[in-house]
Amino acid sequence: MDAFVVLVFILSCLFLLSLWRQSSERGKLPPGPTPLPIIGNFLQIDVKDISGSLTNFSKVYGPVFTLYLGMKPTVVLHGYEAVKEALIDHGEEFAGRGSFPVAERVNKGLGIVFSNGSRWKETRRFSLMTLRNLGMGKRSIEDRVQEEAQCLVEELRKTNGSPCDPTFILGCAPCNVICSIIFQNRFDYKDKDFLTFMKKLNENARILSSPWFQVCNNFPLLIDYCPGSHHRITKNINYIRSYLSEKMKEHQESLDVANPRDFIDYYLIKLKQGNYNQQSEFSPENLATTVSDLFAAGTETTSTTLRYALLLLLKHPHVTAKVQEEIDQVVGRHRNPCMQDRSHMPYTDAMIHEVQRFIDLIPTNLPHAVTCDIKFRDYFIPKGTTIITSLSSVLHDSKEFPNPEVFDPGHFLDKNGNFKKSDYFMPFSTGKRMCAGEGLARMELFLFLTTILQNFKLKSLVHPKDIDTTPVLNGFASLPPSYQLCFIPV
């Protein structure tokens, strides 16, 4: 009985504390729906379609509003103007990484994606500089992507035109590009260690987008005390880091300071220069987390986009025909596509942009946070407040993209058929926290897709009108439904 009384007392205190905090904060923050104690507005959100819920709230409360996901307030920015004003015009103030409890437990504030403050700035600066040294944006990295594109084609030829699920083949190509940058070598697509590595990355992407993960992320107590798929993320990341640690040991044994071969070498040299001390942001642990971040961010996003692109091309064969006609005219059959071709292929460029716009891969972006107290549009947002930016509301803005729910490369073409840029195109986010690998990802999408379409006719197992392109998961990421197709050599 005593234990029951204590439990009731504790819950009552939490209830009253929640009421007090919410009432005192809500007067200063942007408007929003009235939250319930402890759980906040969570029951008013569809965890299977968070971006849709945010759109509905914006119709009532405007482009800047507050939600309580649990007991903490989160400010939501909806629409191009609000997102641009925050992430670009006030980029420094909105450059923090917001609350993401599962990742915080795994990464412990390390790495390039979920770190903050000076650690994030130093790690990001070093990573960008090293990627440039390794050829990012230069011909050398393009050579690697072209080489991998040919390996991808050879692997697809082995299917002999039979039905296949392209998930793992399309995942191997971008992963191998990252492998060549991180530890200099690529893997055979049938390598057992490589396939296990790929499987862990793919499983984590699915779990991150599950409704249960959204629940755990908003109620962190569940992470430690409840069973569920979220524990698989920790196990998978520990496996990936263990694998990477072995690579780091191999690099330490063969390191030549005068001739760095890859990202790991550059980082180990940084440590040898005496920068690894109690105050330094550089450490072996941060290296392992940073490399793990680069793999997670650089593999699954690109492979999912490729997978979705092929599904959309199957659904819209007239688009596929136009792209292949342009490839025949500009590239031909006797050489490999290169990045110089892109400026002469407006329809293909528009198709790839439209794929990224239409699929809306990361609908609510990774959470941001304000780095200081800030007055934003006459509202007061305290330092550390989590900020959600709805990329869906930008990529599917009907004023910029007429009929935004329709897949149409014409969204990125002018009346003369020339490629047309749009400030609303931000699948890689924007501002200080925008994707560090945007240039590489765009290169991979162009070279992999054009090389596939140069060499194969895509054949669906069902009629195009029966192909469903609705994402099966729409939490953290929009993932396409599973499907099979035939790659018919041409």
UniProtKB/Swiss-Prot annotation:
Catalytic activity: an organic molecule + reduced [NADPH--hemoprotein reductase] + O2 = an alcohol + oxidized [NADPH--hemoprotein reductase] + H2O + H(+)
Cited PANTHER family: CYTOCHROME P450 2C29-RELATED, CYTOCHROME P450 508A4-RELATED
EC number(s) from the headed UniProt entry: 1.14.14.1
Name this polypeptide is given: Cytochrome P450 2C26
GO molecular function annotations of the record: heme binding; iron ion binding; oxidoreductase activity, acting on paired donors, with incorporation or reduction of molecular oxygen, reduced flavin or flavoprotein as one donor, and incorporation of one atom of oxygen
Membrane among keywords: yes
Gene: CYP2C26
UniProt family annotation: Belongs to the cytochrome P450 family.
